[in-house]
């Protein structure tokens, strides 16, 4: 597959009060964000509540997203599995519903050494129906993907890249250096999931972002990315300052409660999360709307 780069949306999954996926709102959201210049769609990650949805729901989400996205746009759903067999079965299902790659987190119960991480992902890459993007999100999985493991995996033809949501620029530079030292940088895309540090990640060598903010302000994320790529760093820093303010507002409540409330305020779906997790309260929603209105988001 072509190298992953640019702004890929970490897509929300609109649901009703009972946690049933709202496919009409999902189609509306995909059409909204893909019409604004993003380069890919990543449903069912942390922002998309993939860990909370049943397999049947997840397959239906991928099907709707793939049918709603423009032809040829990468569709990269999240995989949160506890063993290789479970992961491979899920990946095969996604392949049959239009996915083009998968975003795979490490198993999250036992600690994993670098060798164990490499072994797990290598086994998946050897057998999976789709290319892998490794997902480093230690705040949720409690497993940090070791740079040495990622560098070794980067040479695998079925490993396309890594999304780093660790919010640790030191880790990111160590990772990028390890991949470069392994001679695999040309075919392996490091993408950030931390828009508050987007400029720094891009300057360090990341190729783009898979981000929640693109659900709400895709044009702003794209403007930051484009400014860095054009060498307009003063503009990029100013735009990122605004993006940080938006991000701060959208991090209120449990992930991704504020994002759900924000797109509802924009006319897409409702504010509900997948049960048992709770949405923002009416008071919290009013405060969020006030903050986003002051930032010219609403």
What is each model feature region?
Residues 2-144:
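Active-site beta->alpha loop and helix N-cap motifs at the rims of alpha/beta catalytic domains
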Residues 3-12, 32, 36-38, 203-206, ...:
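C-terminal alpha-helical cap/extension of soluble enzyme domains
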Residues 14-17, 53-55, 111, 139-147, ...:
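Generic structural "secondary-structure junction" signal
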Residues 19, 61, 93, 166-167, ...:
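Hydrophobic side chains within alpha-helical segments
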Residues 26, 58, 62, 87, ...:
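A general structural signal for well-ordered alpha-helical segments in protein cores
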Residues 36, 60, 64-68, 93, ...:
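Alpha-helical structural signal in soluble globular domains
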Residues 72-73, 131, 160, 182, ...:
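Secondary-structure boundary/capping positions in well-ordered alpha/beta enzyme cores
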Residues 126, 138-251:
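Catalytic alpha/beta core domains of metabolic enzymes, predominantly
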